[in-house]
């Protein structure tokens, strides 16, 4: 049994950091009160993580690039007719990545303009009219149910792969490696998860973190 590096370290760190921030934002908004400030921090962190993933989707390693897993309708139809165990994301999984980035990204952006009408306002709410704040707040509240559905489907897919297809996706996202026997391709490409790529990812992350800190903490006082 041969192990193949599929998911690079930056992609794995993004995945688990996003999961923790989503969990943190869900808990903090339900507790409410003073924890709404933490809800804002988690939301800003989610926005930064998604921005990082968008950039990494163009400059990252082989399986992290959007060009590797974002496919058109024909490829998706062909996959549904003849499913294969891809080394990286399948066309359906690639579509789910797009859905996650779009809906969680929109939720984070909407949160910047919302209010709970009690003690918390998003950092950008003061720059728009009350009418638009109400619209964004309602959209933010409605979208949370879509996000819950996305999370449920994601967890369901992981369980399906683990117990039905006998493929441990969670372990692969922890270690970065997949068993060659779990892939349909004969000679899968190994991701170049080396120091150069990791330094590049760190530079991108620090640049985003610095810009966000300046805008949201120093300028807006979030």
What function would you assign to each model-found segment?
Residues 1-222:
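Membrane-embedded alpha-helical bundles that constitute the cytochrome b-like, heme-associated redox core
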């Amino acid at each position: 049994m041969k192990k193949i590096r599929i998911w690079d370290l930056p992609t794995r760190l993004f995945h688990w950091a996003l999961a923790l921030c989503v969990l943190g934002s869900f808990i903090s908004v339900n507790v409410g009160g003073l924890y709404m400030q933490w809800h804002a921090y988690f939301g800003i962190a989610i926005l930064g993580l998604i921005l990082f993933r968008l950039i990494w989707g163009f400059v990252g390693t082989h399986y992290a690039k959007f060009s590797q897993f974002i496919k058109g309708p024909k490829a998706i139809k062909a996959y549904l007719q003849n499913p294969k165990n891809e080394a990286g994301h399948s066309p359906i999984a690639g579509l789910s990545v797009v859905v996650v980035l779009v809906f969680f990204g929109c939720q984070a952006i909407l949160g910047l303009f919302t209010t709970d009408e009690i003690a918390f306002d998003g950092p950008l709410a003061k720059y728009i009219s009350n009418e638009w704040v109400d619209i964004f707040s309602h959209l933010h509240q409605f979208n949370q149910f879509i996000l819950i559905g996305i999370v449920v489907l994601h967890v369901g897919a992981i369980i399906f792969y683990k117990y039905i297809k006998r493929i441990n996706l969670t372990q692969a996202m922890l270690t970065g490696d997949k068993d060659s026997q779990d892939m349909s391709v004969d000679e899968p490409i190994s991701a170049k998860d080396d120091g150069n790529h990791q330094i590049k990812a760190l530079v991108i992350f620090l640049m985003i973190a610095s810009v966000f800190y300046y805008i949201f903490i120093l300028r807006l006082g979030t």
